Amino acid sequence: MTELNGRVAIITGASSGIGAATAKALEKQGVKVVLAGRSHDKLNTLAKDMNEDNIHIVPTDVTNQVEVDALVAKVIDVFGHVDIFVNCAGVMRSSKITDYQVESWDSMVDTNIKGLLYSLNAILPKFEAQGSGHVVNLASISANEVSKESALYSATKSAVLMIFNGLEKELAKTGIKTTSILPGMVDTPMTERSDFGGRKKLDPENIADAIIYALTQPAHVNVNEVTVRPV
């Protein structure tokens, strides 16, 4: 198994939900965690529950390419390198296409797709230069399933899944790993209005565990895709 102690990880969307749970899980493994997200206050609140020696906060909006580039540059400046990049930033807006909510469409495309691309544009050259690194992205089971109110959201998650499927082939034999995580319904602020038919939602920690599993595999093992569903 790969030892995570002492490694450096950037987590976007770290202020709540799966991002926050992943930050805590990595910090417990001895990882130096860079918390990135739009809410400085929420990031500070999260950091209070963690070992301050292992935490660095960089407020970042992934829809802003300049801020994403600055995030990675700042981490390189502070730590000298990055080992792990976990993209948890995401937006879900439930609506039918025929509701014509263009602002909602823009928000999902800008965050879920362009935010990932900006992140890859910033981090992959660093990983290529050092010949190692692991990029994890939160997709969703909605990448392969669609309801009458999730067409655009499902499309964005399908897009990022395909991006990662292609990226895995591009990065073969480079030492850089890629992992897509496809969660089912998770109990986060983003899903608080969904009753899920009375079924118990997954906890954010369940997804963090899946991410840790992928990150701790031996050097020759690349876990490309993990689907996690509630029973």
UniProtKB/Swiss-Prot annotation:
Homology family: Belongs to the short-chain dehydrogenases/reductases (SDR) family.
The entry's keywords: Oxidoreductase
UniProt GO MF annotations: oxidoreductase activity
Chain positions recorded as NADP(+) binding sites: 10-34
Keyword Mitochondrion: no
Coiled coil region boundaries: none
UniProt-recorded name of the protein: Uncharacterized oxidoreductase SH0585
Documented EC number(s): 1.-.-.-
Active-site residues, record numbering mapped to chain: 153 (proton acceptor)
TM annotation in the entry: none
Protein's organism: Staphylococcus haemolyticus (strain JCSC1435)
InterPro entries in UniProt: NAD(P)-bd_dom_sf (IPR036291), SDR_fam (IPR002347)
Keyword Oxidoreductase among UniProt keywords: yes
Binding site for substrate: 140
